């Protein structure tokens, strides 16, 4: 029996039937959500497996020496990943050196110093930068930043920093305007809104009472930021920085426009060079055989690097609420 009749003669649904129907709906909902989560994990594993299979001819031919090989020559069918890997790491590192202080400063201004009527417009403007297509950054970098680097910035760097011992070697080379340093400037602008937005949100997690107590004790804004906000949010800040690093590691189009795509080791950061993503973008269309496998092996290296960086960032951001 699925229904009963009350004293007024109205049909009342059986509670057991309703309970069974709800359980079936919950079960279906659980299976759908489980399937969605499983699909995401399966796609991630599938990408990793496909990259590993396609990259296997490269590692079976060159072994692990592919990772530190310095020659990339399609005519000789010899390939090494080190120039592209170093170019990726160096350009990302320089971009972080530029973007992180600016991002933290902007986040401090938005959360501590900015007038209330300007806070939302400025925050929105910064977030809109994240929506600009990367190819636009590349075009602006090529037609605006490269001539500026060639005519003004690089000559000044070569005449000043280039004369210093040790570090000066990084700025001693012909300066066509394209190179790792130019790519780093473009990357720093691209990752700036990401780090700023995350840092601002992390700063907003500091309890208002903690802020007000610090100001009530006579602390200046600088002292509050240094002794209260940054220590309280340090893990979240690092997580946001790591997310920005993950974006910088995988950027393709903007870097391809301005890095120069020279597939050999360089001793100067102002010389044309290459990155993993730029190398793949420039060569993938015409590649076949071992060259194609080597490009996919570069993609596998980039996948592992990006996955590790983003996983660490998520872990650090997730721990923010515990401190």
Language model: regions and residue ranges:
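Periplasmic/extracellular loop-to-transmembrane helix junction in inner-membrane transport proteins
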Residues: 12-32, 51-95, 115-116, 173, ...
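Membrane-cytosol interface at the C-terminal ends of specific transmembrane alpha-helices
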Residues: 104-109, 119, 123, 169-216, ...
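Membrane-interfacial helix termini and adjacent extracytoplasmic/periplasmic loops
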Residues: 61-79, 139-189
């Amino acid at each position: 029996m699925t229904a009963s009749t009350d004293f007024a003669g109205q049909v009342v649904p059986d509670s057991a039937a309703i309970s069974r129907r709800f359980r079936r709906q919950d079960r279906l909902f659980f299976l759908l959500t489980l399937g969605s989560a499983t699909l995401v994990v399966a796609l991630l594993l599938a990408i990793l497996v496909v990259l590993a299979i396609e990259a296997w001819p490269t590692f079976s031919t060159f072994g692990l020496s592919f990772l530190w090989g310095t020659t990339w020559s399609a005519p000789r069918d010899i390939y090494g990943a080190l120039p592209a890997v170093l170019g990726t790491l160096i350009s990302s590192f320089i971009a972080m050196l530029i973007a992180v202080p600016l991002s933290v400063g902007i986040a401090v201004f938005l959360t501590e110093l900015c007038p209330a009527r300007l806070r939302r417009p400025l925050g929105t403007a910064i977030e809109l930068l994240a929506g600009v297509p990367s190819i636009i950054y590349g075009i602006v970098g090529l037609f605006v930043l490269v001539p500026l680097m060639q005519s003004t910035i690089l000559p000044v760097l070569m005449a000043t920093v280039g004369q210093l011992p040790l570090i000066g070697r990084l700025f001693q080379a012909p300066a066509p305007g394209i190179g790792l340093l130019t790519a780093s400037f473009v990357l720093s602008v691209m990752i700036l809104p990401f780090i700023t937005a995350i840092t601002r949100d992390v700063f907003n997690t500091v309890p208002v009472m903690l802020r007000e107590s610090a100001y009530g004790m006579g602390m200046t804004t600088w002292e509050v930021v240094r002794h209260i906000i940054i220590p309280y949010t340090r893990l979240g800040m690092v997580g946001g920085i790591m997310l920005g690093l993950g974006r910088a590691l995988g950027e393709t189009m903007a870097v391809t426009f301005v890095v120069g795509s020279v597939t050999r080791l360089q001793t100067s950061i102002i010389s044309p060079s290459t990155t993993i993503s730029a190398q793949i973008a420039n060569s993938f269309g015409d590649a076949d055989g071992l060259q194609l496998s080597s490009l996919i092996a570069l993609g596998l290296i980039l996948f592992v690097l990006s996955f590790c960086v983003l996983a660490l960032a998520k872990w650090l951001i997730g721990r923010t609420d515990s401190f």
